[in-house]
UniProtKB/Swiss-Prot annotation:
<protein>
    <recommendedName>
        <fullName>NADPH-dependent 7-cyano-7-deazaguanine reductase</fullName>
        <ecNumber>1.7.1.13</ecNumber>
    </recommendedName>
</protein>
<keyword id="KW-0671">Queuosine biosynthesis</keyword>
<dbReference type="InterPro" id="IPR050084">
    <property type="entry name" value="NADPH_dep_7-cyano-7-deazaG_red"/>
</dbReference>
<feature type="binding site">
    <location>
        <begin position="83"/>
        <end position="84"/>
    </location>
    <ligand>
        <name>NADPH</name>
    </ligand>
</feature>
<comment type="subunit">
    <text>Homodimer.</text>
</comment>
<feature type="binding site">
    <location>
        <begin position="245"/>
        <end position="246"/>
    </location>
    <ligand>
        <name>NADPH</name>
    </ligand>
</feature>
<dbReference type="GO" id="GO:0008616">
    <property type="term" value="P:queuosine biosynthetic process"/>
</dbReference>
<dbReference type="InterPro" id="IPR016428">
    <property type="entry name" value="QueF_type2"/>
</dbReference>
<dbReference type="InterPro" id="IPR029500">
    <property type="entry name" value="QueF"/>
</dbReference>
<feature type="active site" description="Thioimide intermediate">
    <location>
        <position position="177"/>
    </location>
</feature>
<comment type="similarity">
    <text>Belongs to the GTP cyclohydrolase I family. QueF type 2 subfamily.</text>
</comment>
<dbReference type="GO" id="GO:0033739">
    <property type="term" value="F:preQ1 synthase activity"/>
</dbReference>
<keyword id="KW-0560">Oxidoreductase</keyword>
<dbReference type="InterPro" id="IPR029139">
    <property type="entry name" value="QueF_N"/>
</dbReference>
<feature type="active site" description="Proton donor">
    <location>
        <position position="184"/>
    </location>
</feature>
<keyword id="KW-0963">Cytoplasm</keyword>
<dbReference type="Pfam" id="PF14489">
    <property type="entry name" value="QueF"/>
</dbReference>
Amino acid sequence: MNTPEDSSLGREVAYPSGYDPSLLFPIPRAAGRAAVGLSGALPFVGRDRWHAYELSWLDAHGKPCVATATLHVPCESPALIESKSLKLYLNSLNATRFNSAEAVRARIATDLSTRAGADVSVEFGLPPIDAVGEGESIDALDIAIDDYGPPKADYLATHAGTVVEEVLASALLKSNCPVTGQPDWASVTLRYRGAPIDREGLLRYLVSFRDHADFHEQCVERIFQDLLVRCAPQWLVVEARYTRRGGLDINPVRTSPQMPTPLSIFRDLRQ
């Protein structure tokens, strides 16, 4: 079984001189899910949406082409794709000739699907940037915080009263690469229907990820599971928009299966 320590993270590697799908490094999701009490049927559906900013190849005549792309990895896939390996894989296309842009798109989709163990969709282009963002920010709350990890679900609580449907947001999420320790920065949005979530407790909880080491996808699943258990919403959506590294950013989203309306798709201003 692949582990993060077996990947190219934190190691000097030679950039590929030609197309090489073996560079893609899948990491099973099961271990990360077991750490937060997830096994068997998942309490959510969703995807890991990747934005690729540095995509290039050669056309049939050897002329370079450039593009951006959006990749959707379903959360039901048995494996996630380690980000440095995806960067190296995409770079392996730089000196490779393709007959058409569609051939590039199809090749990337096939290779990612094979490694992830589920159908991965690929489309050229990126979602628009939303400078305002979705939801009501909780970042201006005037509270003192001195707990930066490990993540503490005990901070999460609800208030008795009328059921609400609201969207809350924070730009203060930070976690760290589990191999290199590099900081990962993100804006997080949660949309839910249920008893009102205590906002001070929610902010303390999100800040308690600050010293936590885990992959982006697993952080979002931990947040979803903790909110589900501690706050018992009727339905819930959690999405994090991580900032770019190596020409890629990752945007995991997890939603309750009964989520009534589709999510809007956009990029954060910091992306």
